[in-house]
């Protein structure tokens, strides 16, 4: 399938890619870009009109630090989702992602850590965090996140902006509103904290996005890092303590399980 049948052609020309690369490299506090009208209009409309109902998404992430649903079983959804995934995982698009980011050998996978959808109802949030940097089943190094928001008529008072923080959590450098057909591409490592505050949306509304994570081979510089939630400066002392305690216990617990040879605790297929 021609990538320009899915991705807006104005973003795939050599001139456009060079311009995005310049913006990506010069973004602070870490490399990221925001692209408007990412998909062709008809594609974005089809994704929006056929977005799966939240009660059909079988992975529910609800804890002190997050409240959202997700899924990646494309065979259960309208064919447009599979068509989009096929283009985004294509060699042609992965080569564009390499040109755009400067990271050689980017590719994605067909599992939960490849592509899928996120959705949150009223009250949904994901506290600021850094991502796990490995797909353990594919044995690949996670390098780039691509999020495309699919929320028509999103209002500022709904909240849900994706916050871009510096590593030390001293300053929030950017807020990306999850408006319709807006893409966010960013480098993911321990220097890239991000998350969104609790949303306040009317009944029937939700915060929706299509995600793809891009990888490279592990390489000699790879060092495993788990996902980790990080307190905001204005969090209460009690919440900061609770987050720190929970994350410390989680990481130590996973280290223990890893020593026992259990590597995929967080990556099991919860949809079967």
Predicted regions and their residues:
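A structural signal for well-ordered alpha-helical scaffolds and beta->alpha junctions
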Residues: 40, 44, 77, 81, ...
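Eukaryotic charged/polar low-complexity linker/IDR segments
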Residues: 145-147
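Histidine-centered active-site/metal-ligand motif
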Residues: 32, 129, 194
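A structural signal for short, well-ordered beta-strand segments and their strand-loop junctions
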Residues: 34, 58, 107-110, 116, ...
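Catalytic core of Fe(II)/2-oxoglutarate
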Residues: 134-142, 152-272
């Amino acid at each position: 399938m021609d990538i320009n049948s899915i991705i807006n052609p104005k973003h795939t020309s050599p001139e456009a890619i060079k311009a995005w690369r310049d913006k990506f490299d010069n973004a602070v506090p870490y490399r990221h870009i925001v692209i408007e009208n990412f998909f062709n209009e008809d594609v974005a409309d089809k994704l929006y009109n056929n977005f799966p109902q939240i009660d059909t998404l079988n992975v529910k992430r609800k804890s002190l630090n997050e409240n959202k649903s997700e899924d990646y079983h494309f065979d259960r959804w309208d064919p447009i989702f599979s068509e989009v995934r096929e283009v985004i995982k294509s060699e042609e698009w992965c080569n564009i992602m390499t040109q755009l980011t400067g990271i050689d050998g980017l590719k994605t996978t067909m599992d939960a850590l490849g592509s899928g959808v996120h959705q949150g109802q009223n009250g949904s949030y994901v506290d600021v965090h850094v991502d796990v940097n490995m797909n353990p089943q594919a044995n690949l190094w996670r390098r780039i996140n691509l999020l495309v928001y699919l929320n028509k008529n999103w209002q500022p008072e709904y909240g849900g902006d994706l916050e871009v923080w510096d590593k030390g959590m001293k300053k929030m450098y950017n807020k990306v509103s999850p408006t319709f057909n807006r893409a966010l591409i960013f480098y993911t490592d321990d220097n890239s904290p991000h998350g969104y505050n609790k949303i306040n949306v009317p009944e029937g509304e939700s915060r929706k996005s299509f995600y793809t994570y891009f990888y490279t081979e592990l390489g000699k510089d790879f060092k495993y890092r788990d996902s980790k939630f990080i307190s905001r400066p204005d969090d209460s002392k009690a919440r900061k303590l609770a987050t720190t305690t929970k994350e410390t216990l989680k990481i130590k617990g996973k280290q223990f399980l890893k020593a026992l040879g259990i590597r995929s605790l967080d990556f099991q297929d919860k949809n079967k």
